[in-house]
């Protein structure tokens, strides 16, 4: 789904997953932490069975995954020159779309360095977005496949047709567009990672993995979920969204190529598989699919949110059972990806000297795992705030300047919105498969302005209250009882947090 924390043939995990956020798990790792589990084979992947194609089993599916093929943009980068020992206005740490968007927005008139170990690397992730979200940001030229609408399979008898265009992001076009603007705005690049930050009253020092120290008045951490620069002072207890996806050539698939499959909660593929069926009944997974043609499709099995998160092996086993049931025969796999997204949990210390944005600043939608459009839209807000304070003659100290930027990033209306989303996550965490189906049956019956706004983080507390009441009124009697039984304590916690949180 719409996520930033996706890895291509890489997953560095120690279970339970709540330990995950203590590590920079997007760092390249040649092997998974479990040496006995084979995520992918280095054998040739055009493997055939008696009918010519794979009738999928877990091992056969993974044997089809090719070796990693890293793609890079081809152009000259203006590099940061450490010999000049200048104090820069801003250092942006990170290499994902958000880091690049911030660098793009902050160039021009300011001295900016982007610290990224692989600045030319094309992101390997599959990003899906609602078309209207990218239209609002003038990024329609960065979409490479569009569907006129989406479909939700609640169960084998009930479907929801969503009249909202959906698209896959063209990763190369998006990065190329951002990089060109960075270069034209005078942004410099330093190919390294930051291992430590030290602060004085007027500036900060970033010590990089290559031994270079970079001085900057403001440090912006856009490294995802590493939590290596931004500090937290509360126990880290998020839920986790976990998914496994493949971009594959198939003999055929049963889906309409004019619609993407937003959620498929059907479980008939688990009939006769007692243990797997029982696990799915307790902590369900759904299929997310983007059909590009009748024989090329992106398929992803996803656990919406769980605490602790499901193991990747479990996700893959469920996916294999689903593909076999749907009669999807895989001819070859272009790429695969693994996704682990911390959702909810506490915000970082606000304010603090390093300014965080994106995953490291708690900006993932706690109920959905969505982040791409929300954070890309936030980048210019943060950029304008930083520019405003840097060019003013107020004489702010480094701490005061960062505090003002944090305030603009997390104003009280955004904090209240996030509290409501965390309330939603806490309810979803307690729902089994049948409860989850009942919830989304009601959710997608809401007026489009409500479910559009909720998924895209466009509703604030004055709109979220009537949204919640409308959802409750659309829910079945059983669903209402579940919400009251399982949502009472989360509701009390939310109200308490809202009362205590004041500007």
Curated annotation (Swiss-Prot):
Superkingdom assignment: Eukaryota
Presequence extent in this chain: 1-85
Enzyme Commission number(s): 5.5.1.19
Compartments where located: Plastid, Chloroplast; Plastid, Chromoplast; Plastid, Chromoplast membrane; Plastid, Chloroplast membrane
Main subcellular localisation: plastid
Binding residues for NAD(+): 90-117
Protein family: Belongs to the lycopene cyclase family.
Protein name: Lycopene beta cyclase, chloroplastic/chromoplastic
Biological source species: Narcissus pseudonarcissus
């Amino acid at each position: 789904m719409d996520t930033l924390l996706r890895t291509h043939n890489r997953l560095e995990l120690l279970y339970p997953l709540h330990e995950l956020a203590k590590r920079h798990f997007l760092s390249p790792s040649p092997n998974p932490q479990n040496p006995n589990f084979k995520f992918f084979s280095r054998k040739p992947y055009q493997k055939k069975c008696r009918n010519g194609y794979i009738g999928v089993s877990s091992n056969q599916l993974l044997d089809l995954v090719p070796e990693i093929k890293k793609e890079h943009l081809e152009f000259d980068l203006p590099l940061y020159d450490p010999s000049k020992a200048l104090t820069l206005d801003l250092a942006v740490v990170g290499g994902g779309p958000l880091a690049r968007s911030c660098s793009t927005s902050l160039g021009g008139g300011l001295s900016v360095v982007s610290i990224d170990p692989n600045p030319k690397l094309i992101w390997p992730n599959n990003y899906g977005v609602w078309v209207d979200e990218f239209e609002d940001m003038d990024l329609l030229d960065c979409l490479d496949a569009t569907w006129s609408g989406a479909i939700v399979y609640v169960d084998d008898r009930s479907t929801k047709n969503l009249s909202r265009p959906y698209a896959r992001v063209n990763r190369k076009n998006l990065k190329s567009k951002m990089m060109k603007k960075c270069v034209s705005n005078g942004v410099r690049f330093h190919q390294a990672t930051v291992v430590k930050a030290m602060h004085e009253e007027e500036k900060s020092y970033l010590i990089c993995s290559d031994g270079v120290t970079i001085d900057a008045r403001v440090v912006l951490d856009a490294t995802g979920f590493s939590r290596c620069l931004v500090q937290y002072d509360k126990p880290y207890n998020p839920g986790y969204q976990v998914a496994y996806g493949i971009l594959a050539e198939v003999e055929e698939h049963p889906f309409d190529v004019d619609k993407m499959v937003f959620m498929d909660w059907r479980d008939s593929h688990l009939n006769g598989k007692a243990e797997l069926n029982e696990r799915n009944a307790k902590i369900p997974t759904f299929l997310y699919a983007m059909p590009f043609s009748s024989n090329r499709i992106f398929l992803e099995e996803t656990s919406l949110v769980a605490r602790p998160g499901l193991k990747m092996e479990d996700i893959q086993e469920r996916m294999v059972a689903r593909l076999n049931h749907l009669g999807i025969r895989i001819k070859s796999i272009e790429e695969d990806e693994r996704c682990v997204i911390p959702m909810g949990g506490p915000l970082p210390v606000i304010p603090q000297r390093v300014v965080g944005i994106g995953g490291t600043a708690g900006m993932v939608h706690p109920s959905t795992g969505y982040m791409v459009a929300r954070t890309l839209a936030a980048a210019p807000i943060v950029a304008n705030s930083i520019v405003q304070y840097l060019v003013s003659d107020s004489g702010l100290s480094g701490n005061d300047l960062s505090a003002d930027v944090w305030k603009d990033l997390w104003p009280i209306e955004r904090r209240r919105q996030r509290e409501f989303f965390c309330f939603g996550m806490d309810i979803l965490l307690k729902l089994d498969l049948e409860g989850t189906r009942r919830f989304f049956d009601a959710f997608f019956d809401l007026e489009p302005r409500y479910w559009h706004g909720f998924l895209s983080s466009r509703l604030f507390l004055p709109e979220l209250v009537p949204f919640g009441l409308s959802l409750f009124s659309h829910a079945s009697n059983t669903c209402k009882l579940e919400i009251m039984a399982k949502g009472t304590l989360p509701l009390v916690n939310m109200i308490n947090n809202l009362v205590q949180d004041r500007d």
